[in-house]
């Protein structure tokens, strides 16, 4: 209930784009967020690969607790190669995120969708944009508060040549 109230407050304070197409993670909180922020969207799709990274043994535990654990620290250290039991390997997660962004834009081009919203999780946003957005930034520099994100755009030349988008605003 607290999260829903925060989203409704954000919606009252800020102007979210009016879009007809919304892509969201299949997780309940993402679908609910999409419904609150984009209630008039005519087409809402849940996309399995927009889900957050699988945390395995660390699933559903507060980050403030996890940062105290050595195995978690190893896992989030770039290049460590450590994968906790049941977790999604970091390289696989990043590959999935990059591929999903490609698929979303390819769908939009094929279906002539000029504006859409994507409601997903912080780690997915950071991964997608660090790999496929200009300006080029490290993942943590793309962090967004809950209910917030980025407006990105591309053009045919930039997309066909480099498979990149350009971040132009914060939502």
Regions found by a protein language model. Give the residues of each.
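Active-site-proximal alpha-helix that buttresses catalytic centers in soluble enzyme cores
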Residues: 1-37, 41
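Phosphate-handling substructures
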Residues: 37-96
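Generic beta-sheet signal
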Residues: 113-122
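GST superfamily/GST-like fold recognition
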Residues: 122-126, 155
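Acidic, His/Gly-rich catalytic cores of divalent-metal-dependent hydrolytic chemistry
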Residues: 162-171
